[in-house]
Amino acid sequence: MSKIIQAFHSSNKNYTPIWFMRQAGRYLPEYQVLKRTTNSFFELCYNPIKAAEATLQPIARFDFDAAIIFSDILVLPDSLGINIRFINNLCPTAEKIPNLLDLQKSKIQNTKISKVYEAIDIVRKKLNKKKSLIGFCGGPWTVLTYILGYNSRNTPKFHEIKSNNKHELIVDSINILTKHTIDHLANQILAGADIVQIFDSWAGILPYQEFSEYVIKPTSNIVKTLKEKFPHIKIIGFPKGAGKLYHKYTKETNVDGISCDYDLQLDEMLKLQKNVLVQGNLNPNTILSKNSKIIEESVIKIMDTLSNNRFIFNLGHGILPETPIKNVELIVKLVKNYHSSE
């Protein structure tokens, strides 16, 4: 059993497991070398050998307790035939916004997305058995925001959901994406993932009622269906920006773990920790600092607050491309040595 899986079952006062969201990627010089051997980001995602190499790079360098497969939440819509492009390498958006009715008729192109599962299989065979392998997906609502451009509550398109009577179409589309998401996660589990995480990056833009219907309901469906098939698999939810709704999300979705963003206060995480494993929530901007004392103080504060119960140390969002390697090394050292210094 991996150290991360152990953390789900009971608190380990002698060790706190650690991994980082987006730990495989642009901040690593070895990743930049690998990236130059492909023509695009998606080409790298769909090359099992190279995706596996990217996945294992941060394990080799930092000895994290888990590998997370090098992929993207947008491989799902891409495999549905929706061409996703990264504008200025930052903002992913559909090249042509599909009609919602057309989206509901879309079918998965297995020749594309199966490459992700091949990469997982390769990684699992190479990865130390004491380390977990994390598969992941985007929450159906978040994936839909990228497909349709509802990425900001202030954009007219968000308000069109109600003003143009699109609510039922949105719900139907989320239901379709939920089915595809369940299949995608199940295939990652079958390929070798022992943990899966659901990234709902745009959960926080939703009002209460829509949060319940667009985020909680499909996530609950995903968790229930996967648990029926794979009761041993651990599922982490990440409703970024949900604030006080983290509690509602945790209670009603039945996730095994909750990943918390950096805006959530530690006392709120402590409350969550009474019922579920918590993960997080160091601000990625903090580890850009040239002042190691600032980083150390932030890490120790989180560890002092949360490490005596079910807890995985992580960031409150993905690691930034400009993050200094030495700062990551410092954090890993602080977390791994924390209990021995008590």
UniProtKB/Swiss-Prot annotation:
<feature type="binding site">
    <location>
        <position position="41"/>
    </location>
    <ligand>
        <name>substrate</name>
    </ligand>
</feature>
<feature type="binding site">
    <location>
        <position position="317"/>
    </location>
    <ligand>
        <name>substrate</name>
    </ligand>
</feature>
<dbReference type="GO" id="GO:0005829">
    <property type="term" value="C:cytosol"/>
</dbReference>
<dbReference type="GO" id="GO:0006782">
    <property type="term" value="P:protoporphyrinogen IX biosynthetic process"/>
</dbReference>
<feature type="binding site">
    <location>
        <position position="146"/>
    </location>
    <ligand>
        <name>substrate</name>
    </ligand>
</feature>
<comment type="function">
    <text>Catalyzes the decarboxylation of four acetate groups of uroporphyrinogen-III to yield coproporphyrinogen-III.</text>
</comment>
<keyword id="KW-0210">Decarboxylase</keyword>
<feature type="binding site">
    <location>
        <position position="201"/>
    </location>
    <ligand>
        <name>substrate</name>
    </ligand>
</feature>
<dbReference type="GO" id="GO:0004853">
    <property type="term" value="F:uroporphyrinogen decarboxylase activity"/>
</dbReference>
<feature type="binding site">
    <location>
        <position position="72"/>
    </location>
    <ligand>
        <name>substrate</name>
    </ligand>
</feature>
<feature type="binding site">
    <location>
        <begin position="22"/>
        <end position="26"/>
    </location>
    <ligand>
        <name>substrate</name>
    </ligand>
</feature>
<keyword id="KW-0456">Lyase</keyword>
<dbReference type="InterPro" id="IPR038071">
    <property type="entry name" value="UROD/MetE-like_sf"/>
</dbReference>
<comment type="pathway">
    <text>Porphyrin-containing compound metabolism; protoporphyrin-IX biosynthesis; coproporphyrinogen-III from 5-aminolevulinate: step 4/4.</text>
</comment>
<dbReference type="Pfam" id="PF01208">
    <property type="entry name" value="URO-D"/>
</dbReference>
<keyword id="KW-0963">Cytoplasm</keyword>
<feature type="site" description="Transition state stabilizer">
    <location>
        <position position="72"/>
    </location>
</feature>
<comment type="similarity">
    <text>Belongs to the uroporphyrinogen decarboxylase family.</text>
</comment>
<protein>
    <recommendedName>
        <fullName>Uroporphyrinogen decarboxylase</fullName>
        <ecNumber>4.1.1.37</ecNumber>
    </recommendedName>
</protein>
<comment type="subunit">
    <text>Homodimer.</text>
</comment>
<dbReference type="InterPro" id="IPR000257">
    <property type="entry name" value="Uroporphyrinogen_deCOase"/>
</dbReference>
<dbReference type="InterPro" id="IPR006361">
    <property type="entry name" value="Uroporphyrinogen_deCO2ase_HemE"/>
</dbReference>
<keyword id="KW-0627">Porphyrin biosynthesis</keyword>
